[in-house]
């Protein structure tokens, strides 16, 4: 595991309130695109056919990638344990490697916020490593205290929306990605995006955007939960930071 590096003249602590407040937090898909697209194009143009095929397949359906990485055998809920399921269990072993290699090349020289939505309590509880009861019955204060104790490692790829309100709903995770975070903007080539999909040349722009508006954080990323909030409608929002990656 390698610790994230940081440089430049700003506050040397990437997790300072100053850096987090100044980070890019796109309010629209267009704003996110203006920040993320150029680097994505550079990486895409240099990618191999196998790498492009792999990440495009992921955007079409991520289950065959993420289930074995999380230790589920062929369907969600059939949990065997992380590392106990062959990564080629659903025929995606080579694609997982190609996608990992591709995302390794995609980093930004800016601090960026992303938003992830998990629609079910089961999914959110699994992501956080807590019982469902904790989400449904604990106070935000108690839940925050528990989650702050231990950083959480997501062994699978983490799909996020690239701007506020983008991506899926349900339990909302605001994810702070300090400069150097390995992640790839996928909207230009995503199967469900409004870009040019797999045929994208790494240069053509777009003016409309899909609701997923996806950016994918590298698999094996460790997150630190820093805040839990509940609004008047009972919706839980979690703030977290990328602290370590493979």
Residue ranges and their predicted role:
Residues 2-246:
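Mono-ADP-ribosyltransferase
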């Amino acid at each position: 595991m390698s610790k994230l590096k940081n440089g430049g003249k700003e506050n040397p602590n990437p997790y300072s309130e100053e850096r987090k407040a100044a980070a890019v937090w796109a309010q629209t898909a267009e704003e996110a695109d203006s920040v993320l697209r150029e680097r994505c194009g550079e990486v895409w143009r240099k990618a191999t056919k196998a790498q492009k095929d792999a990440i495009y397949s992921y955007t079409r359906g991520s289950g065959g990638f993420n289930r074995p990485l999380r230790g589920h055998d062929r369907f969600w809920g059939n949990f065997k344990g992380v590392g106990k399921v062959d990564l080629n269990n659903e025929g995606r072993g080579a694609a997982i490697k190609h996608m990992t290699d591709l995302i390794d090349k995609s980093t930004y020289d800016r601090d960026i916020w992303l938003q992830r939505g998990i629609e079910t309590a089961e999914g959110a509880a699994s992501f956080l490593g807590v019982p469902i009861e904790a989400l449904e019955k604990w106070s935000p204060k108690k839940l925050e205290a528990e989650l702050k104790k231990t950083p959480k490692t997501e062994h699978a790829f983490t799909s996020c929306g690239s701007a506020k309100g983008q991506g899926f709903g349900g339990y909302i995770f605001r994810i702070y990605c300090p400069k150097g975070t390995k992640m790839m903007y996928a909207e230009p080539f995503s199967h469900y995006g409004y870009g040019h999909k797999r045929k994208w040349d790494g240069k053509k722009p777009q003016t409309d955007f899909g609701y997923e508006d996806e950016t994918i954080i590298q698999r094996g990323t460790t997150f630190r939960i820093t805040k839990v909030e509940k609004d008047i409608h009972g919706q839980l929002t979690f703030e977290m930071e990328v602290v370590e990656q493979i």
